[in-house]
């Protein structure tokens, strides 16, 4: 009876707590996310409502993702500039969620408050089939909610929406106070 408890240490017990293994089965993720979309779809009457419900769920996830990333980061420093926060989202947050960086980060030519994160083939839309009557549905609204929460909880309040353009584009529109603060920091 005691022989089963006297084996050598398990590889699981040897892992460091600071950097847990973050891989999730793609099929498990696809199943859970499609069930989440179906659950939300059964409780709404329009595509806009469905996208806002997915964004609200994404905001809940985003707050927790930010907490986890900040807790794991060694020598964590708080970003004070908009570009630094956006690069954190494009790099560290995207890697933690999807295993790779986002494809592109761009700023709008005509508006200093607007930035775009472009993902050509978003993982979140890969296994979702959309009927023709809901052709405007973009399930990346969930990702937009995550990004909005990460930025807002980092001290950069913004509104993030998902659009179909060059794949999926997340449009990030910061509040005017954020841009004014960024300009004031540049002047120092």
Swiss-Prot record:
Subcellular location: Golgi apparatus, cis-Golgi network; Endoplasmic reticulum
Modified residues (Phosphoserine): 10
GO cellular component, one term: cytoplasm
Location (main, coarse): Golgi
CDD domains: TRAPPC5_Trs31
One Pfam family named in its UniProt record: TRAPP
Phosphoprotein keyword on record: yes
InterPro entries: NO_sig/Golgi_transp_ligand-bd, TRAPP-I_su5, TRAPP_component
Gene3D superfamilies, sorted: Trafficking protein particle complex subunit 3
Keyword Ligase found: no
Transmembrane segments: none
Keywords, alphabetical: Endoplasmic reticulum, ER-Golgi transport, Golgi apparatus, Phosphoprotein, Transport
One BP term from GO: endoplasmic reticulum to Golgi vesicle-mediated transport
Family under the similarity heading: Belongs to the TRAPP small subunits family. BET3 subfamily.
Protein task: May play a role in vesicular transport from endoplasmic reticulum to Golgi.
Quaternary state and interactors: Component of the multisubunit TRAPP (transport protein particle) complex, which includes at least TRAPPC2, TRAPPC2L, TRAPPC3, TRAPPC3L, TRAPPC4, TRAPPC5, TRAPPC8, TRAPPC9, TRAPPC10, TRAPPC11 and TRAPPC12.
Protein name: Trafficking protein particle complex subunit 5
Gene that this polypeptide is encoded by: TRAPPC5
């Amino acid at each position: 009876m005691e022989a089963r408890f006297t084996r050598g240490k398990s590889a699981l017990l040897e892992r460091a707590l600071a950097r847990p293994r973050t891989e999730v089965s793609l099929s498990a993720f696809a199943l859970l996310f499609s069930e989440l979309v179906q659950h939300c779809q059964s409780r709404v009457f329009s595509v806009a409502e469905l996208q806002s419900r997915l964004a609200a769920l994404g905001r809940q996830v985003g707050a927790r993702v930010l907490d986890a990333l900040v807790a794991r980061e060694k020598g964590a420093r708080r970003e004070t500039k908009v570009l630094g926060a956006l690069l954190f989202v494009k790099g560290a947050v995207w890697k933690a969620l999807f295993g790779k960086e986002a494809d592109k980060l761009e700023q709008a030519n005509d508006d200093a408050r607007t930035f775009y994160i472009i993902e050509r083939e978003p993982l979140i839309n890969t296994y979702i089939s959309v009927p023709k009557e809901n052709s405007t549905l973009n399930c990346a609204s969930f990702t937009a909610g995550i990004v909005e929460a990460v930025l807002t909880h980092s001290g950069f309040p913004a509104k993030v929406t998902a659009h179909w353009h060059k794949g999926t584009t997340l449009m990030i529109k910061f509040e005017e106070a954020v841009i004014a603060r960024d300009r004031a920091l540049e002047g120092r």
